[in-house]
Structure formats: structure tokens, C-alpha cells
Curated annotation (Swiss-Prot):
Pathway: One-carbon metabolism; tetrahydrofolate interconversion. GO terms for biological process: L-histidine biosynthetic process; methionine biosynthetic process; purine nucleotide biosynthetic process; tetrahydrofolate interconversion. It catalyses: (6R)-5,10-methylene-5,6,7,8-tetrahydrofolate + NADP(+) = (6R)-5,10-methenyltetrahydrofolate + NADPH; (6R)-5,10-methenyltetrahydrofolate + H2O = (6R)-10-formyltetrahydrofolate + H(+). Catalyzes the oxidation of 5,10-methylenetetrahydrofolate to 5,10-methenyltetrahydrofolate and then the hydrolysis of 5,10-methenyltetrahydrofolate to 10-formyltetrahydrofolate. Its EC number is 1.5.1.5, 3.5.4.9. CDD domains: NAD_bind_m-THF_DH_Cyclohyd. Keywords: Amino-acid biosynthesis, Histidine biosynthesis, Hydrolase, Methionine biosynthesis, Multifunctional enzyme, NADP, One-carbon metabolism, Oxidoreductase, Purine biosynthesis. InterPro entries: Aminoacid_DH-like_N_sf, NAD(P)-bd_dom_sf, THF_DH/CycHdrlase, THF_DH/CycHdrlase_cat_dom, THF_DH/CycHdrlase_NAD-bd_dom. One of its GO terms (cellular component) is cytosol. Homodimer. It comes from Saccharopolyspora erythraea (strain ATCC 11635 / DSM 40517 / JCM 4748 / NBRC 13426 / NCIMB 8594 / NRRL 2338). This is Bifunctional protein FolD 1.
Length: 293
């Protein structure tokens, strides 16, 4: 593991997620095999109501990862013209199915469909991506709940690379229910002092330069540059923005900040693989409650 020093450094450490994700998947594979021997086959269901190709690619990657680890993964494609009623009915059906242990509602959704409203139909004990408002409320209250997997991946990466949090300053850029807000809550639970920045924040760099840990999750490529960071900062780049040549870039200008921060997650190969691994881990945790006594 890599320890990030608390003092300034001229070398930026790469905080990769591939090794961590591999370890989580190995644990998932072992647990899935044990559950299967006990008559419980872990099953994840992903509800899709879009023809967006990037979304389809992501869902297929989850299905492949699940299969490699011994989980079943059902892709429930309702079509891009699915109604709110049909999506809600499917989520309710899956929530009531004892053979299903994890449910994900994939975005984007058809026009007029409200994600939070629909996610409320996911049974909290199967809400492996922390989408149900009840799950988010329990997370904010410090009660047991599945955190959104991407937000959980941020904390898992920080722990894996032994980045201290208690008493440190955390700055989160972005306030979505998927990453920004839950990441801030998780940092608070680890005794960090947290600031959340958003589109109306004045003088963004004034806030981000104070960060010991900077989490960026807004979907704007190159938003964070050298002027926004300090040498002691550890930067977690959650952005995954497609490029014209088929690649991915983050919300952080890697060229600009490299050598100017203590640590930086790569895109791809940082938060992404850990997110997928944690979705499978959450599904295993849910399935374990179905284990025959």
C-alpha cells in the first residue's frame, strides 16, 4: 500500500483502484461460492430503460464482472419508451422476488421519469447502489445502509492508500445524490471537516486549495487545474467523460495537476473498477441474509 505523506511533496502518487478492485472481487468470488453451496445463488438485477450506448456498455461491464465472480446478473431492459408506471412495477416485482438480492436502476431514464421517485420502489435491503431516499437518509443519520457504490469507492480508495481522514479537511466538488452528498456524509463519519462546492460556489479555488482530500464529481472534463490545488492535496477524480477518440478523461486536468498534488486517482483505472466491485460486494452482503440457517 502507498502512504500519502501529510507534508508537501513534488511527486504525485498514482492512487490506482485496480489492485483494490481485484481484492474485493476475489472476496466476492469466494463468498459467492460458499453461498451457492448453501443453496443461495447471489443474483443482481439491473433495470434499464434507455438506448444510451455508454449506459449499455456500463451495464454489460457489470454483468461480465458478476459472471466472473459467480453471481447471476439479470439485465431487465424495459426499452427507452418505458413508462414511469412500468418501471415502478418492475422495481416492485424485483423487490418482492426472494431470488433477487440486489437491484440497480440504471440511468438515464425516459423523459418525465424521476429517478428519486422510482428509486423509492427499491427495497432498502436490496438497494445495493444506495439509490432509495430511505437509504440516503439512513446514511446521513449514520445508520446502517448501502451507500451509493461510487461514493463508497471513494472512501475505499482512500483507506486502501492509507490516506488519513480524521481531523483533515475534505472538499467535495459536486452535490449529486449519487456521489457528492453521500461522499461528504462518509467523510464526515470519518471525522473529516467537509466543505461541499457546487455550481453557485464563488471562487472555487479558494475552497479547493484548502483540501487535504479533494473529491471531484461533476462531469466537467478538466474543471480542476493547477490553480485549484495545493501540494498536500490528495485528489479523487470521479469524473468519467468520453472523448472523441473513444477514451475517458476525468474532471481533473491530469497534465496540469500532476507533480503539484500529493496523490491523484487515474481515469480510467481509479474509482471505476472499485465501484463495480463494491456493487457485487453489496449484493453478496444482501444474499448472505438469505442463507439458510
Amino acid at each position: 500500500m502507498t502512504t500519502i505523506p501529510s507534508s508537501a511533496t513534488s511527486a504525485t502518487k498514482t492512487l490506482g483502484g485496480t489492485e483494490l478492485a481485484r481484492g474485493i472481487r476475489a472476496e466476492v468470488t469466494s463468498a459467492a461460492a460458499e453461498l451457492t453451496l448453501l443453496g443461495v445463488t447471489p443474483r443482481l438485477a439491473v433495470v434499464v430503460a434507455t438506448d444510451d450506448e455508454s449506459s449499455a456498455w456500463y451495464v454489460r461491464s457489470i454483468a461480465r464482472a458478476a459472471a466472473k465472480s459467480g453471481l447471476l446478473c439479470d439485465i431487465v431492459d424495459l426499452g427507452a419508451d418505458a413508462t414511469t408506471q412500468s418501471i415502478r412495477a418492475e422495481l416492485q416485482r424485483l423487490s418482492a422476488d426472494p431470488a433477487v438480492h440486489g437491484i440497480i436502476l440504471q440511468t438515464p431514464l425516459p423523459a418525465g421519469a424521476n429517478f428519486e421517485d422510482l428509486a423509492a420502489s427499491i427495497a432498502p435491503d436490496k438497494d445495493v447502489d444506495g439509490a432509495n431516499p430511505l437509504s440516503l437518509g439512513r446514511l446521513a443519520a449514520g445508520l446502517p445502509a448501502y451507500a451509493p457504490a461510487t461514493a463508497a469507492a471513494v472512501l475505499a480508495l482512500l483507506d486502501h492508500h492509507e490516506v488519513p481522514l480524521a481531523g483533515r479537511t475534505g472538499v467535495v466538488v459536486g452535490r449529486s445524490n449519487v456521489v457528492g452528498k453521500p461522499a461528504a456524509q462518509l467523510l464526515l463519519q470519518r471525522d473529516a471537516t467537509v466543505t461541499v462546492c457546487h455550481r453557485y460556489t464563488q471562487n472555487l479555488g479558494h475552497h479547493t486549495r484548502t483540501a487535504d482530500v479533494l473529491v471531484v464529481a461533476v462531469g466537467r472534463p478538466g474543471l480542476i487545474t493547477a490553480q485549484h490545488v495545493a501540494e498536500h492535496t490528495v485528489v479523487i477524480d470521479v469524473g468519467t467523460n468520453p472523448t472523441d477518440d473513444g477514451g475517458l478523461v476525468g474532471d481533473v486536468d491530469e497534465t496540469s495537476v500532476s507533480g503539484r498534488v500529493a496523490g491523484l486517482t487515474p481515469v480510467p483505472g481509479g474509482v471505476g473498477p472499485v465501484t463495480t466491485a463494491l456493487l457485487l460486494q453489496h449484493t453478496i452482503q444482501s444474499a448472505s441474509r438469505s442463507e439458510p440457517s
